[in-house]
Amino acid sequence: MDRVCIIRVSTAMEHNPYEEPKTSQIKDMFGIQDSSDGSDLIRKFVVAETEPLEIATLTDNGYVLEPPNLIVPAGTVVYDDIPDDLARAVLGFPDPSDKGALLLGNVVGSSGTPVALNANVVLPRHVLIVGSTGTGKSWLLGKIAEQLHERGLRMINIDIHGEMNRATEQMGGKVYVPGKDLKVPLSSLAEPEILGMVPVQHDLHIDILTKAVINLKAGKTKFGIGDLKSEAIRVGESYGAKQNTLDIISARIDQLGQIPFIGQGLDWKAALSESGTIVNIDCRMLPQSQLQLVVAAITRDVYNARRTGAIPPLVMAIDEAHLFLPATDKAETATVLSQLIRMGRHIAFGLILVSQTPGDLDKSITKITNTRFIFAIEPSELSSIYGALSDAPPEIVKGIPRMKSGTCLLVGNRETVRHATVFEVGGRSTHHGGETPTMLQ
């Protein structure tokens, strides 16, 4: 076949001289049937504004796509539909039957092309999901979780609102509640985090405690409250501290035992041993200060386990991501999550960030995510990620705040999503916990 130019219609407007205001008014006055539905009117036509996307050539090995570097001659025949396999190639979607294809929904429009993303390409380069409350973010996250489960990929979900609990159990996964059946070892916390939990103010006490933490961290082994107390006493004695000073420091360290989420820690190798395991961390009961510490510790443990090969490739999803990667003050989680985002691709560890206020997210992190799902969102929030909308036409971007629930704009770089497209998220087989309840019966 000859080369064909694939174009995207941005806007369309009908030109119908038979239905101008004056003639339409006269027809109404005399009861003459209008011609708005006529399809065989000689002077009636539609003007469409288009954008060339790709030049496609069919070969024995499929379609070869090239940048649109030719001028389409006037009078060239235009087809209003293209074959499904060509549409997938243009958008960068794999065949839905491929083993690594994540089936998420269908493109909005007459073609209804299935939206399938290549898990091996998309997940290691990280994903961003944004949208206002009730627009479909949690529905999509649940859909992705189902697809990962079906394909045998492990997933850890940091669930701020407890929305994935029931769905996790339906998929045979495990729900953990920090402070109840999930604790984090003291050694998984960073030095400033540990010092911030021990109520010491005297300079000598702070120096002794800091040195003790540094020594234990240098040992690169797991340690707990008892280990910290023993090391602090040893350091204090080497400083020539009096017994009452050592007693005060010991008493302060003992108070760490009252923090409910400090403990032995979870065996992540065992928790993620089965193919397709979903682990949901229900963080509803954690106050903001503890939430930061728990998520930071979990991320460090899982990252180190994956880096050393102790656990298989996996995906971690984080709801309300702006709490952990803020645009202004650095949270406890920012350092470790930033490291994961930079290094995740090299160790097969993907990250999915979900937020209803992307303007509060660290801008550098937003840019690093290679695949983005944009649901209906306020214009002020949309402007904060305007530079991350790839080649989405201005007309589509303008309509994002008015998108219906469950419909989103999908964008990415050329490796993940070749061209921006609007699609409707498909159905789910598990419970949706993010549904807005009815206030009046």
What are these regions (language model features)?
Residues M13-H15, E54-T57, H161-N165, D181, ...:
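Conserved nucleotide-binding/hydrolysis micro-motifs of P-loop NTPases
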